[in-house]
Amino acid sequence: MDEKYDAALDLLRRLNPNNLTENLQRIIGLEPELAEDLLSSIDVPLKVQQDSKQSGRPFLCCDYNRDVDSYRSPWSNEYFPELSAEDLQESPFPSESLRSLEVLANDSFDVYRDLYYEGGISSVYLWDLDEEGEFAGVVLFKKEGSNKESWDSIHVIEATKGNDDETFTYRLTSTIILALDNKQNDTSLAGNLTRQTEKEAKIDTSNTDISHITNLGTLIEDIESQLRTQLEIVYFEKTRDIFHQTRSQKSTTDSQEQQQKEVIKGLQNL
């Protein structure tokens, strides 16, 4: 089982990242027993669904807000498409207190999205952990452009109590999925970048919700800035260097071929 899982991951790393979703489904079709492990460990571009109970307001879909083939909206707290009454009884929902924090988080990160992304869609989903007051969740951002260009940010969070009631440890696993496509010269660039970080922070016990939003907002803002910088300075620059080197080698090869043709032509004229 482990060998098949490792082989699947290795194969996905070598295939075109633009076709990640399709390739993942094909592998699961071949080895269904790998489905749960692969879906929980492989981040794919986020889907968009509409909340018909909130005037068709869009929300983002991932494995964390999915139940059966439906997705829970952060706006109405209902599943779309609608689940049967039997399935709905078993469907996961946040507790009442955590739902209050989830609503505040969605409103807050919607403002963040508007300021930093100048468009796009954001969604936040939270779920309870075993210890009272602790929770986990995911913060999602998606911005699409023309020609299938897209930026997906997936931040999986875990908030657990520290040594005292006023301290929380926030663990964050962030993934950026980027796709760029230039139709004019048939050039595309796609891939993903994942980083983990952890931070301890104080909370105001008289207003824990605001404290959690402030701490998570600061943490996500910092990691997104770092990832953007890393993509721009490290990965884009390295890709450009490889591209220029390839073009330079091709020019050198073309020049050598021309010189060889001239030598052969000269010998033929002797």
UniProtKB/Swiss-Prot annotation:
Residues 245-258 have a biased composition (Polar residues). The keyword Magnesium does not apply. GO terms for biological process: actin cortical patch organization; barbed-end actin filament capping; mating projection actin fusion focus assembly; mitotic actomyosin contractile ring assembly; mitotic actomyosin contractile ring contraction. Keywords: Actin capping, Actin-binding, Cytoplasm, Cytoskeleton. It comes from the Eukaryota. Pfam families: F_actin_cap_B (PF01115). It is found in: Cytoplasm, Cytoskeleton, Actin patch; Cytoplasm, Cytoskeleton. Residues 245-270 are annotated as: Disordered. Its main location: cytoplasm. GO terms for cellular component: actin body; actin cortical patch; F-actin capping protein complex; mating projection tip; medial cortex; nucleus. One of its GO terms (molecular function) is actin filament binding. F-actin-capping proteins bind in a Ca(2+)-independent manner to the fast growing ends of actin filaments (barbed end) thereby blocking the exchange of subunits at these ends. Unlike other capping proteins (such as gelsolin and severin), these proteins do not sever actin filaments. Belongs to the F-actin-capping protein beta subunit family. PANTHER family: F-ACTIN-CAPPING PROTEIN SUBUNIT BETA, F-ACTIN-CAPPING PROTEIN SUBUNIT BETA ISOFORMS 1 AND 2. Component of the F-actin capping complex, composed of a heterodimer of an alpha and a beta subunit. This is F-actin-capping protein subunit beta. It comes from Candida glabrata (strain ATCC 2001 / BCRC 20586 / JCM 3761 / NBRC 0622 / NRRL Y-65 / CBS 138). The gene is CAP2.
